[in-house]
Regions:
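Negatively charged
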Residues: 1-164
Length: 164
């Protein structure tokens, strides 16, 4: 069965390369209107984007962005807060991210991200607060000055999965 309007790989779509968060936001909104909340957006080249704050805040987007090149992103604060997003982003390069403040707060997200390199993240406060997250991140190593205030507030994560 073919899902028309969901998987963009079935269509000839010109890859887009936004240079600002506003351009990226516009592309995402247009794609969601045209193809729905579960559309594949892996063809969007986000390699110039450094700020992803509030990108999917309160959104019902739950499409594929697993192959995005996030290696230049420095801020992911509130990126998926209050959103329905719950897809694989385990391969993202987050090694240059400084802030993940409230990134998944109140979100549906519950996918493995235990292999992320978070050593440069300085702010993880409220990151998973009141979210569905319950995955193993015990191998994460943060800098000694990282803000972890209420990172797991009212989150169902098991103690053994938390950072050591």
């Amino acid at each position: 069965m073919i899902k028309i309007g969901k998987d963009l790989s079935k269509f000839s779509v010109k890859s887009e390369k936004p240079s600002t968060k506003d351009e990226l936001t516009s592309i995402i909104e247009n794609r969601m209107r045209k193809y729905g909340n579960e559309c594949d957006m892996n063809d969007i080249d986000i390699s110039l984007i450094t700020d992803m704050t509030h990108l999917f805040f309160g959104s019902e987007f739950n499409g594929n962005i697993s192959k995005w090149d996030t290696s230049h992103v420095t801020d992911m604060s509130y990126m998926f807060a209050w959103s329905s997003f719950n897809r694989d982003i385990s391969e993202w390069d987050v090694s240059n991210v400084n802030s993940m403040n409230c990134m998944f707060t109140h979100a549906e997200f519950n996918q493995p991200i235990g292999d992320w390199d978070v050593k440069n993240v300085r702010n993880m406060s409220w990151m998973f607060s009141e979210s569905k997250f319950n995955q193993d991140i015990s191998r994460w190593k943060t800098g000694r000055f990282a803000n972890l205030v209420n990172m797991f507030f009212d989150c169902p994560i098991k103690e053994v999965y938390k950072m050591k």
